[in-house]
Amino acid sequence: MTEENQVTAQEEAQTPFELQIQRIYIKDVSFEAPNLPTIFHQEWKPQLGFELDTETKQLDEDLYEVVLHINVSTTLEDSGDTAFICEVKQAGVFTIKGIEGIQLAHCLASQCPNVLYPYARELISSLVNRGTFPALNLSPVNFDALFMDYLQRQEAEQNAEAPAVN
């Protein structure tokens, strides 16, 4: 290995991980309360539905868009009437340097959604409040655990598809 190659290899090994927020924005939002105002005359025993998903797209070298999709729906336990449905797509553009492969996947699936989630949670809370429903405080989400579950499911699927060796 030449001296120039050694310097380049050392520089690459020492390239620090960098995560920068370029922009955070609302990509899509919807709030529906189809049974207002009659639902206010019913006893408030809500059943909460919560769905969460992420989507990532590479925009340029080291530049990624991450979109956090959250769908919250509430029905009343006794009547089954829908109180409200709130859908939010909270997005951000991030510069990510110094990592690749599984580390990059982890950053996009965990660290970036961790940045976006408080914005989405506050927006959902505000929309529910403006619908004059009781306060809704969504619990924190462990995106690291969700990513690990995803990796385990992927590994299990690959093992199930692999031919048996006798």
Curated annotation (Swiss-Prot):
GO biological process: protein folding; protein tetramerization; protein transport
Subcellular location: Cytoplasm
Organism of derivation: Actinobacillus pleuropneumoniae serotype 3 (strain JL03)
Chaperone keyword on record: yes
Gene Ontology CC: one annotated term: cytoplasm
Gene Ontology MF: a single term: unfolded protein binding
Free-text function comment from the UniProt entry: One of the proteins required for the normal export of preproteins out of the cell cytoplasm. It is a molecular chaperone that binds to a subset of precursor proteins, maintaining them in a translocation-competent state. It also specifically binds to its receptor SecA.
Name of this chain's protein: Protein-export protein SecB
UniProt xrefs under InterPro entries: SecB (IPR003708), SecB-like_sf (IPR035958)
Assembly and binders: Homotetramer, a dimer of dimers. One homotetramer interacts with 1 SecA dimer.
Family, similarity comment: Belongs to the SecB family.
PANTHER family: PROTEIN-EXPORT PROTEIN SECB, PTHR36918
